[in-house]
């Protein structure tokens, strides 16, 4: 019960929490009002970096959401050329994470990480179409248990300025394992083949729990 109300935070959040706490103490010495603002900032930092446990279905017939957020795209596209799959057709689901969403990302399926590719870029609003091509991003090319290519792309946004990768090439992952996070508002794209989408535009998702697609 305690962990549900006060979930643990991601290690990336520790230094920000310390900084926010220090600022709060300084502001308290100046005035109670400013101290209250600092306290609210500290609470928000804790909330942003929260890393709650999730109930994972553990079923290879499904893909689960890699991110908390809102579905903004469900479409058929060419695969990402950055990982050499632009000669294949994929379905793609895009999920936008606002600054109040949990930003820890998880793998949609069990399988092997065949490639990880970081691409520097710009910081347009992550909800825009061009964010998939122009923004800073990190690609995870996975092979699921049936041999299907699954690609997860972490995309930095207007406020997000750092993509954190916690996964290694050739690593074997279980569905719902943490793969990294993006700081302060961002987007996750999932490219997949041989699954049918289960979500619609405007739907809210929970990382590791919401079923995105089914074989």
Regions found by a protein language model. Name each.
Residues 1-215:
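Contiguous, well-folded functional domains in the mature portion of proteins
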């Amino acid at each position: 019960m305690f962990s549900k109300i006060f979930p643990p935070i991601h290690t990336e959040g520790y230094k920000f929490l310390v900084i926010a706490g220090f600022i709060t103490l300084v502001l308290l010495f100046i005035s109670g009002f400013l101290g209250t603002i600092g306290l609210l900032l500290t609470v928000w930092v804790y909330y942003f970096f929260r890393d709650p446990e999730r109930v994972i279905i553990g079923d290879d017939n499904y893909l689960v959401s890699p991110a908390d957020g809102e579905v903004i795209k469900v479409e058929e596209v060419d695969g990402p050329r950055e990982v050499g799959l632009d000669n294949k057709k994929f379905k793609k689901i895009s999920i936008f994470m606002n600054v109040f969403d949990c930003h820890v990302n998880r793998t949609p399926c069990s399988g092997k990480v065949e490639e990880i590719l970081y691409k520097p870029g710009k910081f347009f609003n992550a909800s825009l179409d061009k964010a998939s091509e122009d923004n800073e991003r990190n690609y995870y090319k996975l092979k699921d248990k049936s041999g299907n290519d699954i690609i997860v792309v972490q995309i930095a946004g207007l406020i997000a300025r750092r993509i954190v990768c916690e996964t290694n090439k050739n690593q074997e992952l279980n569905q719902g394992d943490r793969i990294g996070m993006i700081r302060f508002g961002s987007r996750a794209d999932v490219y997949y083949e041989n699954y049918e989408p289960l979500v619609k535009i405007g739907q809210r998702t929970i990382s590791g729990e919401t079923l995105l697609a089914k074989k």
